[in-house]
Amino acid sequence: MITFRPATPDDASFIARHVLEALHWGMYELPLTEEKVRAWEELTEVCRLPETLYSAENATLALVDGEPAGLLVAYDGGRYREFRANTFPRLSAFADKDVDIMPDESQEGEYYIDSLAVAPQHRGKGLGRSLLLEAVKQAQIAGLRATLLVDPDNPPALRLYSSVGFKDEGQLWAFGQWYRKLEIRF
């Protein structure tokens, strides 16, 4: 059975691992390199802090039989700049990504779905769709349009987002590559 619960700072390691997995870091490809371990450790600390992009306060966990199996990180896009300023200076792994000159991923009026990831053993079972629908519901409750970025070279993710009703709104350069910006307006 799938249930959801708000994350807590005690979930920081799970959050960090799955944020990095969403960014295609291969966090389930063992053995982990020193770079991946360092990024995981640094991001874990960021996830414990309030008012960061990946803070536990912005995260929802999907549980399967009571165990964490998936992650959603989403927040009011009007706070993106504040959260970004509190996040990237703490992460050496992003030092070469020009985050200071990167355009904002989100803005006022958006409920930004920053990260969505499912542990490998739970993929293909509808958990990602359940998390995405939870995010869309939260956006509606907040009276904001739901937005996200997706790697255009990720056809399964593009199909999932399209099937839920997300529409392509253009492209955005972030973290050294182009992403598609998708949204649902209510």
Positions of predicted regions on the chain:
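Conserved GNAT acetyl-CoA-binding A-motif
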Residues: 109-111, 123, 139-151
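Conserved N-terminal entry element of GNAT/NAT acetyltransferase domains
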Residues: 1-10, 30, 186
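Conserved beta-strand in the GNAT
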Residues: 61, 67-76, 112, 117
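Active-site rim helix/loop that mediates acceptor-substrate recognition in acyltransferases
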Residues: 36-59, 63-64
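Conserved acyl-donor/pantetheine-binding loop and adjacent beta-alpha core of acyl/acetyltransferases
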Residues: 76-111, 115
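Conserved catalytic-core motifs of GNAT/GCN5-like acyltransferases
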Residues: 77-79, 147-150, 162, 167-181
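Conserved GNAT-fold acetyl-CoA-binding loop/helix
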Residues: 24-47, 92-95
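Conserved acetyl-CoA-binding loop-helix of GNAT-fold acetyltransferases
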Residues: 118, 124-137, 159-163
